[in-house]
Amino acid sequence: MRTLKSLVIVSAALLPFSATAFAADAIQEQPPVPAPVEVAPQYSWAGGYTGLYLGYGWNKAKTSTVGSIKPDDWKAGAFAGWNFQQDQIVYGVEGDAGYSWAKKSKDGLEVKQGFEGSLRARVGYDLNPVMPYLTAGIAGSQIKLNNGLDDESKFRVGWTAGAGLEAKLTDNILGRVEYRYTQYGNKNYDLAGTTVRNKLDTQDIRVGIGYKF
């Protein structure tokens, strides 16, 4: 009887320690709560932007008197536009204005290009952080012919189309490379009583840097 009583007393004394150990084991066995994952905000191409470009043009001027002349040279200017975005489709309007130093002579006839600009639609596909795009619209340029006796300068209107790749360098800085084909059609020039018919096509590669608002 005394032995049974001693066992009861010892068991009662150990009970708090057993409960504490069980509780500690239960706490340790609970899986850790995962930390919340912060999702970075999706970049949007929507909004206004502006920038500068530098390029090189390969031109072909067909004339009715001396045949083809190829006045190739550098060009530079500025561009600005506005994008809209729906899911991954990016679309908008863009304009550019610049100057071409293209000038070349053949058999006494010189063809010289000057101011040039365009107003175009643009549509691209968001592959964040890059966007391939297509563009097309109207174009204009000042083109001068000189045969040594007389010269005439005319502002020519035509069309332009091309494709490019734009890249997000930072949240606000954009980089791009673009190919453009432009055709200014046929125009007659009166040079000292001689009518010279001219057609000018240009192909150029441009690289640019822009700022997105």
UniProtKB/Swiss-Prot annotation:
Pfam families, A to Z: OMP_b-brl
This protein's name: 25 kDa outer-membrane immunogenic protein
Family: Belongs to the Omp25/RopB family.
Localization per Swiss-Prot or TrEMBL: Cell outer membrane
Native source species: Brucella abortus biovar 1 (strain 9-941)
Signal sequence interval, chain numbering: 1-23
InterPro entries on file: OMP-like, OMP/PagP_b-brl, OMP_b-brl
Record-linked SUPFAM superfamilies: OMPA-like
Gene3D superfamilies: 2.40.160.20
GO CC, alphabetical: cell outer membrane
Keyword Cell membrane applies: no
Principal subcellular localisation of the protein: membrane
Alphabetic keyword roster: Cell outer membrane, Membrane, Signal, Transmembrane, Transmembrane beta strand
Recorded superkingdom: Bacteria
